[in-house]
């Protein structure tokens, strides 16, 4: 009896000494730390699926999708169809399939993951990725994005140390793995989507603009007609685009002021990947919580309306065309005009690539340049400018 009491006492002492430390290690276990590349404002990470080593864009606003040829290589199995809308509001049906033995980083494993089967996309090909990883790929984890070190940290099954459930706000969509949260714009509340697949800080829904324009201090600074961007379903139809200045948006306890943005035809306003410049984002998919830990306290002035070229050019109809025209250019060019030269760079041998065109435009020094358009067998040189 005495021996049993001594052994019990020893076990209790060992638990008191080591138990707390062991529990701490379990609760704060880091499943994996994954360095990411940031290429054309896309977060890209390595992924291995059924022995196929590849890369994916991390897209917290989308569903997992894989290009058809790579899905075949992964020996994907058909799983029906799904319908989604892209950034241009274009709905399209996609076949779905299951892929097996998914490894994200070294330790995070998924036995079976459903993916949309996407057509071959030159944008994905240019980036060297198989497709996009949506929130559904991280449904059994807690994901931290830390832009200071360009890492994603995947915790399982618990949140990072010292992070309480009450430190975050609820994800609004209980049925999907999209990161919808509530933010405050001036005195109004609005539902937004945190979307790492979106390039800028803020992409403002035209529906939210129509709802809030008369009861807030939103200012329209410019206007255009054209295509918002290339989406999964390709180029959208031309729409009216507004350039806006938003006085204030508060994400949890952090206030951003003087925010410039453009409008989109999406149903929801989007906070994009640029949020990561200002703090860590943690998404607890299992408990449906969102955390934003700003690097600096106090207000951050975002500098007002964005400075953009007064025309946009994209590959379209097997050539390069003007796809967005801001008001200062509406009497000089037309939607669909063929562009054959940008500031001295001939496009005759340029690949039909959005990335290639963006690189040429970004290389123009200063705030002015020129394009040469070809129309009715006539070539015309036209000055272009950056403007707010």
Region locations from a protein language model:
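Pepsin/retropepsin-fold aspartyl endopeptidases
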Residues: 22-388
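Bacterial Sec-dependent N-terminal signal peptides
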Residues: 1-28
């Amino acid at each position: 009896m005495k021996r049993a009491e001594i052994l019990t006492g020893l076990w209790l002492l060992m638990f008191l000494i080591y138990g707390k430390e062991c529990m701490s290690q379990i609760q704060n276990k880091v499943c994996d730390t994954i360095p990411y590349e940031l290429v054309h404002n896309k977060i890209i990470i390595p992924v291995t699926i059924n022995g196929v080593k590849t890369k994916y864009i991390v897209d917290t606003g989308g569903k997992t999708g894989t290009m058809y040829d790579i899905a075949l290589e992964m020996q994907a199995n058909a799983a029906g169809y799904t319908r989604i809308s892209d950034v241009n509001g274009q709905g399209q049906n996609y076949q779905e399939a299951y892929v097996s033995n998914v490894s994200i980083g070294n330790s995070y494993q998924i036995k079976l993951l459903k993916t949309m089967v996407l057509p071959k996309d030159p944008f994905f090909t240019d980036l060297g990725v198989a497709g996009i990883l949506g929130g559904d790929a991280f449904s059994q984890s807690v994901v931290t994005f830390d832009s200071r070190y360009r890492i994603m940290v995947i915790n399982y099954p618990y949140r990072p140390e010292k992070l309480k459930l009450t430190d975050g706000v609820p994800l609004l969509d209980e049925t999907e793995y999209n990161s919808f949260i509530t933010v405050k714009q001036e005195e109004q509340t609005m539902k937004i989507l945190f979307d790492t697949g979106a390039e800028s800080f803020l992409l403002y829904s035209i529906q939210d603009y129509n709802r809030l324009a008369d009861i807030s201090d939103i200012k329209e600074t410019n206007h255009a007609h054209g295509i918002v961007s290339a989406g999964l379903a390709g180029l959208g139809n031309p729409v009216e685009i507004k350039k806006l200045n938003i006085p204030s948006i508060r994400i949890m306890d952090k206030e951003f002021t003087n925010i410039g943005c453009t409008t989109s035809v999406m149903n929801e306003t989007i906070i994009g990947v640029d949020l990561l410049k200002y703090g860590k984002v943690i998404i607890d998919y299992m408990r449906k919580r969102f955390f934003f830990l700003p690097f600096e306290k106090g207000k951050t002035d975002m500098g007002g309306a964005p400075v953009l070229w007064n025309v946009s050019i994209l590959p379209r109809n097997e050539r390069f065309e003007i796809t967005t025209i801001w008001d200062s250019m509406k009497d000089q060019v037309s939607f669909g005009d063929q562009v054959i030269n940008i500031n001295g760079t001939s496009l005759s041998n340029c690949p039909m690539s959005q990335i290639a065109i963006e690189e040429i435009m970004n290389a123009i020094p200063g705030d002015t340049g020129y394009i040469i358009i070809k129309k009715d067998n006539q070539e015309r040189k036209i000055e272009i400018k950056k403007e707010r």
